[in-house]
């Protein structure tokens, strides 16, 4: 292949077109682990509109798992969802992390109307053996 020739990729970052949704209803998926919290805003059909996490708010390291980082991520995701045209949201919470309550409270403080909160954490009926306990 001759030098200097591109391989079909654009030279710079391309500007992404903002999505507008026709339906004003959406779902806020709050996935909270001990290390991080991810908030994904989707349409009621499941198409992703936007997402935010503890890391996208500018927090690094172990502080990504804190309640503060998850509340910042929830506000960030809610603002982007409102720009896309979402007005009502149902919150689905998953995981054992510390940021789940803070994320729900932060979503309630925004201008989004909360239609319901559902806990969809998966609980094993004695499935796989958990990892051994940490000794400090």
Language-model features, listed with the residues they occupy:
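Ribosome-associated RNA-binding proteins
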Residues: 1-136
């Amino acid at each position: 292949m001759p030098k200097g020739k591109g391989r079909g990729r654009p030279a710079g970052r391309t500007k992404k077109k903002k999505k507008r949704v026709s339906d004003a209803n959406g779902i806020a998926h709050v996935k909270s682990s001990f290390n991080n919290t991810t908030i994904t805003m989707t349409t009621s059909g499941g198409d992703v509109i936007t997402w935010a996490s503890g890391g996208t708010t500018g927090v690094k390291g172990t502080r990504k798992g804190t309640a503060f980082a998850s509340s910042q991520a929830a506000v960030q995701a809610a603002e982007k969802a409102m720009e896309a045209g979402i007005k009502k949201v149902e919150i689905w919470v998953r995981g054992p992390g510390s940021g789940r309550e803070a994320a729900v409270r932060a979503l309630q403080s925004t201008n989004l109307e909360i239609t319901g909160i559902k806990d969809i954490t998966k609980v094993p009926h004695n499935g796989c053996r958990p990892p051994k306990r940490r000794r400090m």
